[in-house]
């Protein structure tokens, strides 16, 4: 137990004192604000963005020097006549600037890791892609048996997030500033839920960056136990007496954490908890997966250990029902908009020795990914592209747009869904989604022109909708025109793209 505490303290003691002077530099806030409003990843520009500029930010900083900082946020409804923004605009600048500053150490750590490898390094933007997770699952999970499907609880108290930064930010004023920004959007006596609480801090797009940093910092704190256990278990492979004593000593610490009474006759069975070197951990947002080659009993021990350890040391309430034990060969795993499983593909090999011949039955494990068509249709129904049965309907709110704009919107949605679900082994589900979007687009245009769908197609022709029906194979041909003969038929197989950085609302139906 003491060794684990020293490990966590070592991770937390990595301070970056050089960041403190940046908090008081006005150009940091100007740069962070300008970069925040210049980015448009999968989002449309708003009118508020057009009103923002670097000159406005400089004027805001100048007026911040002339006002009492404790009076700025007292009345949010009071509008600043000089700038044309609410007084909440000040907190926006501070939160964006502070989020930019605290991200610097992690960016430097990424640069140092890239410089250490020098050659044969994967580009960082490829590692950031969501699809980069699936090749890892395909290579690793086909050899594993069980996994823990963990749903990380998201209600986090404001003070817990602030306490996470106290280990490496020793400046009290900075911590009070973060606490003030968080409490501005939620009561200090409540917990804020990222996706449900309408008045929560995270729902404010302008402060989402700071919240995501604080939340991920908190998650990384209790994820660090996996690195500690892996380092310990990696040196427990020898059977010498000296290492055996280390095993007993280390298992005693695990026993203290999980509060389990270990008997002598159960020692070898319980030792398997830390003996297993083949553990794989993957997390994206609130979804975490812990897979192993062990048995169901082994995964139950890990479940008990994780729930107890995280609750005692990180104030993270894990209900046991949030962690499911899944057998890969029998059940599907819902992850990142896919249904993943490990299928057994039987194969028969005929062998002959001299005059005798016999058949050998082999079963090869294969990692398979499918598109969950029912939840995807439910997402389309929630966004009014179809009804609950999957029948396409018109989109009345888009009927006032131009024809080209309507077709472009439907086509963009269709291409994004096809692009994201290109890793599916069966493409028939995507054809149904394309059909729903195409007919919904046609009905929207027919509604705008006060005509029927058949009359609309007869008058304008079906080629008007071919823009968003481009297949994945056509996209590959446009991307690699010289390799068209080589890529023929590739679209029927699974394709993982390394340029997908976020999940759309239609895919993230949960």
UniProtKB/Swiss-Prot annotation:
Its main location: plastid. Keywords: Chloroplast, mRNA processing, Plastid, RNA-binding, tRNA processing. One of its GO terms (cellular component) is chloroplast. It is found in: Plastid, Chloroplast. The keyword Chloroplast applies. InterPro entries: Domain_X (IPR024937), Maturase_MatK (IPR002866), Maturase_MatK_N (IPR024942). GO terms for molecular function: RNA binding. One of its GO terms (biological process) is RNA splicing. It comes from the Eukaryota. Belongs to the intron maturase 2 family. MatK subfamily. Usually encoded in the trnK tRNA gene intron. Probably assists in splicing its own and other chloroplast group II introns. This is Maturase K. It comes from Penstemon heterophyllus (Foothill penstemon).
């Amino acid at each position: 137990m003491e060794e684990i505490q020293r490990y966590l303290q070592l991770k937390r003691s990595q301070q970056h004192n050089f960041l403190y002077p940046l908090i008081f530099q006005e150009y940091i806030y100007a740069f962070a604000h300008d970069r925040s409003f210049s980015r448009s990843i999968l989002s449309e520009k708003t009118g508020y963005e057009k009103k923002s500029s670097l000159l406005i930010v400089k004027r805001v900083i100048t007026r911040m020097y002339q006002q009492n900082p404790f009076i700025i946020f007292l009345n949010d409804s009071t509008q600043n006549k000089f700038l044309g923004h609410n007084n909440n605009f000040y907190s926006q600048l501070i939160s964006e600037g502070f989020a930019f500053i605290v991200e610097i150490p992690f960016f430097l750590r990424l640069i140092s890791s890239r410089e250490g490898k020098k050659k044969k390094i994967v580009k960082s933007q490829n590692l950031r892609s969501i699809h980069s997770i699936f090749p890892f699952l395909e290579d690793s999970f086909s050899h594993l048996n069980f996994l823990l499907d963990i749903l990380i609880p998201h209600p986090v108290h404001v003070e817990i997030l602030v306490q996470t930064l106290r280990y490496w930010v020793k400046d009290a004023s900075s911590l009070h500033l973060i606490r003030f920004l968080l409490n501005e959007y939620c009561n200090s006596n409540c917990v804020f839920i990222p996706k449900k609480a309408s008045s929560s801090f995270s729902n404010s797009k302008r402060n989402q960056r700071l919240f995501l940093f604080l939340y991920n910092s908190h998650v990384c704190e209790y994820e660090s136990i996996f690195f500690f256990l892996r380092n310990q278990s990696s040196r427990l492979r020898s059977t010498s007496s000296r290492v055996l004593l280390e095993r007993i000593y280390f298992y005693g610490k695990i026993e203290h954490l999980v509060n389990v009474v270990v008997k002598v006759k159960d020692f070898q069975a319980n030792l398997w908890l830390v003996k297993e070197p083949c553990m794989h951990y993957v997390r994206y947002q609130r979804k975490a997966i812990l897979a192993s080659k062990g048995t169901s009993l082994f995964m139950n021990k890990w479940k008990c250990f994780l729930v107890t350890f995280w609750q005692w040391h990180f104030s993270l309430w894990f209900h046991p029902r949030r962690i499911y034990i899944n057998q890969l060969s029998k059940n599907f795993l819902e992850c990142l908009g896919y249904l993943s499983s490990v299928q057994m593909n039987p194969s028969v090999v005929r062998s002959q020795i001299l005059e005798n011949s016999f058949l050998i039955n082999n079963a090869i494990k294969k990692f398979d990914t499918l598109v969950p068509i029912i939840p995807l249709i439910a997402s389309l129904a929630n966004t009014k592209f179809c009804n609950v049965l999957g029948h396409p309907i018109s989109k009345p709110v888009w009927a006032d747009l131009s024809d080209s704009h309507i077709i472009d919107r439907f086509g963009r949605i269709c291409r994004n869904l096809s692009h994201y679900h290109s890793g599916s082994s069966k493409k028939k589900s995507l054809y149904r989604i394309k059909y729903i979007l195409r007919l919904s687009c046609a009905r929207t245009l027919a509604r705008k022109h006060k005509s029927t769908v058949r009359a609309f197609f007869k008058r304008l022709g079906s080629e008007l909708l071919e823009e968003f029906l481009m297949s994945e194979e056509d996209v590959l041909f446009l991307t690699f025109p010289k390799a068209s003969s080589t890529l023929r038929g590739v679209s029927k197989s699974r394709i993982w793209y390394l340029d997908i950085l976020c999940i759309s609302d239609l895919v993230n139906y949960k």
